Amino acid sequence: DGGDEDDSTDPTNPIPGGNGRYLVLYCSRTGSTERMAQQIQQTLDCDILEVEPQTPYESDYNGMLNRAQEELAAIRQGNYPAIKTSVEDFGNYDIVFVGYPIWYGSMGTPMQTFLHNHASKLAGKRIALFASSGSSGISASVDEVRTLCSGATFTETLLLTSSTLSQMGNRIRTWLETLGASRENNHPSTSMHVKITVGNRTITATM
């Protein structure tokens, strides 16, 4: 997991897509959430940033599950596992898309740490949650995020399970339409309205 993006990129700086109104944050181990994040980024032409654990997860599935259980137990005690990703400022973003895998019903631990660390900076932002899972629901993880980021507002969520991943493109497009998120809205300054007057007629053109 982890994708093809340049690992040398400063983790404090989102990878620019359009530097507009939207930011896609994601963590992913098997690649499902990453594919969702990339689809959203490509549709909106927006910035994207991977939230990475300080220590990479084991390639062995059972080893990863054991570590996930340990980290979830630690979080319940208020101890968040270290990550190497941070964002200085969310000031330019209207919607922050937050993507994660669901582990044992909970949000993947790297993203829990990120939101815990950035809760005050996300106050007042709209957060759009999307997640992937084998079969688990999303509701418990939504409750976790609402507790972590109590100052934010939340949109409708998107969950893809192993049985619906093949519908990813259509599901994401429908979801983004529901949110009113589009490439055009991400770059509102790219449209220019020009009034053209000919005699007593005035025509407004969008360029």
Specify the residue positions occupied by each region the protein language model found.
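FMN-binding flavodoxin-like domain, especially the glycine-rich phosphate-binding loop
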Residues: D6-L23, C27-Q54, R67-P188
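Hydrolase active-site cap/lid region
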Residues: E58-R67
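Short, solvent-exposed loop/edge segments of extracellular or virion-exposed proteins
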Residues: T197-A205
